């Protein structure tokens, strides 16, 4: 449907530790992160996250250091596996994808800039912005047009 979100997260939990699925019910029953750490030596990363992201919108994930921003983003492309929850991208259940299907979704439906990213110093800003498209095999005209479009969108046109 036209109103369906581009990305939908439902009931997302991430508990770091070897028995994450076993202790999940304690968190769902109200156990806080301090008690979870003290009693089970597990760390609560995400707790019952529910988000819809529409196509064309800019979504900001903001919070203090250690609040779970990077953990949340890494769940979208399954760089981190959730303890529980649902991830839909264009209506596709990302949790049910094979490695090859997941690789295809990562290449065609999303991208990510890591916190400790490394720009290639011998390339221009536009060439760095176009790098993923080059790796994907897009022609040079498409690479340049897309890079210019997105650089303009974030106020970096002309670099």
In which residue ranges do the predicted regions lie?
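Conserved structural motif at the start of ABC-family nucleotide-binding domains
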Residues: 7, 44-46, 105
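ABC ATPase NBD Q-loop/coupling interface
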Residues: 18, 27-37, 86-104
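Conserved ABC ATPase "signature" region
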Residues: 25-35, 90-93, 130, 134-137, ...
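ABC ATPase NBD coupling module
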Residues: 36-41, 95-111, 135, 140
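Conserved coupling/switch loops of ABC nucleotide-binding domains, chiefly the family-specific signature
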Residues: 83-86, 142
């Amino acid at each position: 449907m036209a109103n369906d979100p581009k990305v939908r997260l439902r009931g997302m939990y991430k508990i770091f530790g070897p028995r994450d699925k076993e202790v999940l019910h304690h968190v769902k029953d109200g156990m806080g992160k301090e008690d979870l750490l003290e009693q089970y030596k597990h760390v609560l990363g995400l707790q019952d996250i529910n988000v819809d992201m529409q196509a064309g919108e800019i979504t900001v994930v903001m919070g203090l250091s250690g609040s779970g921003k990077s953990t949340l983003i890494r769940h979208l492309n399954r760089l981190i596996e959730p303890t529980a929850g649902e991830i839909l991208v264009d209506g596709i259940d990302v949790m049910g994808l094979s490695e090859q299907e997941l690789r295809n979704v990562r290449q065609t439906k999303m991208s990510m800039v890591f916190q400790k990213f490394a720009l290639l110093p011998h390339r221009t800003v536009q060439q760095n912005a176009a790098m993923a498209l080059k790796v994907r095999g897009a022609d040079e005209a498409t690479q340049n047009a897309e890079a210019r479009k997105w650089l303009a969108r974030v106020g970096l046109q002309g670099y």
